[in-house]
Amino acid sequence: MKTKKLSVFFLIGLFLLMLFSPETVATGAANGLLLWYRQVLPVLFPFLLITGLMIRTESISLINHTLSPILKPFLGISENASFSVVCGFLCGFPVGAKSCSDLTDKGKISSAEGEYLLSFCNNVSPAFLTGYLSVQSLNQPELAQICLLFPILAALCCSFLFRRWYLPRNPFAVVEEQADPRQFLPFSEALDESILSACDSITKIGGYMIVFSVLISFMAKLSFQNFFWKLLLLPGVELTGGIRMLCQLDLTSELRFLLVMAHCSFGGVCALFQTKCMIRSQNWSFPRYIAEKLITAMVTSLFAFCYMKLFG
């Protein structure tokens, strides 16, 4: 009951704030919409479409069969889970989460394995790390390989820790025998379903980006000067805008690099909500997922700290 009352008061307060600050709302919404339209829609929509199409056809079988001899013993996963690992590390938020959920819905992997995959297979894309982060934001293209390496390495290292939560008795080998061959659709039907699913997902992602862009516009007007607000909380709302904020602050290059690495590994609150949207059909623990992303962010920042101390 208290939570419901707090939600009501929060929404009423937000509504009044929007009424008295229409310029801030318009600016934030426009920034979020343009960011979605120019950078997210043309990049992410094709990946959402093609991954959905591959899951609905037999296309993923070749990927799983090719990569499972390496990934299966290394990560402790079943053969059918190899595709999610590829999506999670190559396609960016929240394609990895959607592939985990879709494979679980299709009966290709168990719910426990899907949740385990989510703990380390839903990451920022390599193009974002090497392009937007190292070149456009940090203006240090020589750090592109390092920016790419640390989040991936941290996620893989943390997977060995998270595995203990999901693999008490290695339950991931059973689902392969339970897969229903009727789940593969004719290409035209699979394409229709994939387009509809991709449109639904990309629209929800855009909605969250607009909401959090408006929120960060209001938060940026607050004149708090403490470390937690300026360097952690405010940039952690939305990743792209947060990195831009950090790069505009008067920070040492070492501290800036450490912070952007941590934020990229965490993904931001906006990415958390996008992920929650993609896994809504699953009974997975979202607080545990948040804890896993925070742990991965700390490991990434530790790698960045060691690198700056040794080579900075």
Roles of regions detected by a PLM:
Residues 74-138, 233-251, 257-279:
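Alpha-helical membrane segments and immediately flanking helix-loop junctions
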Residues 108-164, 278-303:
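Membrane-core helix-loop-helix motifs of multi-pass transport proteins
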Residues 167-196:
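Intrinsically disordered, low-complexity non-transmembrane regions of multi-pass membrane transporters
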Residues 191-264:
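Transmembrane helical segments that form the transport core of multi-pass membrane transport proteins
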Residues 305-312:
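Juxtamembrane boundary at the C-terminal end of a transmembrane helix
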